[in-house]
Amino acid sequence: MMINTAVLLIFDFNTNVCIVSQKDLDFSSDVVYEYVSKRLNRIIGDAAQKTGVFYATSAFQMKLQALVDGTLTFDDLASQIARELYQLVSHCDEPESTDLLVIDFQDDDDVRNLGILMLDNKTAYTHQILDDEGTVYNKLIKHYAILPGTAQKAEAYALIRLNDFSIHFVDKKRKMDGEDVYLLPDKLLQCTSVISSKEAVKVVSKIAEKVAEEHGASTVEALSKAKTYLVENAETADSFSPQDLGSDVFGDSPVLQREFEEQVKEAKLPEAVAIEKEYAQKAGRSHKIKTDTGIEITFPSEYIENTDFIQFINNPDGTLSIELKNIGKIVNK
């Protein structure tokens, strides 16, 4: 990744003013480079990203085309984005002071991207050192415009590849005239919204658990099989099919499989969901359960079908026993 340029713009709703910077950020400063690069690295490849396609009538896409063609400068585009977003945020029921970071950068494929990051200001306490006629003293003050730390992900952002105008974004729900809105896709970008891989995995997992529970099947087995499917599928594909996942989890029961497929359709999940291999492996690597007796167990998801290591036994009295096998060593943590 290489950052070409970036600019910071301010939405201050304490004084109701949009401050448009007339200079880009100075990347000769290590502090500036560290903050901007870490912010980008936190969101690139984020599994929570939704994807979108510009509507044919999107005015924003035309501005991007002008940027690519060289008829609109980066600074002019950033200023236009800031003024439009400021107006949108100001019309929200509870406008929050925000710093807007607009970045022009090359990704790891050397494709030019535009990044739009909305950084909500935080209130924090800090110290102030004062000098009163030679007497030095410390004072506690409240700061109303603290930027989120580099370890935090931006709650609202958009990344747009300028070679094909593909969009990846995360946004938070806001209230405008009492109605729920997502400012970035609905108002600024004017684009479609496709479920993120993180959300899709969460939805199919809930459906698998619900179907298993309603039909008296093992929810632990269903969820573990779903996770194993994600890991194995990610080895050869960059997307997964919710329907295929259901076939793999409930392959032994046509009734449960049909029920799963019907609920997937009701949830309006796409036929294929893009998913990063790294996220699939992270999400499917292990499964954690907690018993009503307070015992917690975490085990590799693929072990659910291997009784050499763990076995779930249904007792005659309706209780459940869990047997752990072939343990050579126990480590306290």
Please annotate each region the language model reported:
Residues 2-283:
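Long, hydrophobic alpha/beta structural blocks
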Residues 247-333:
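C-terminal structured domains
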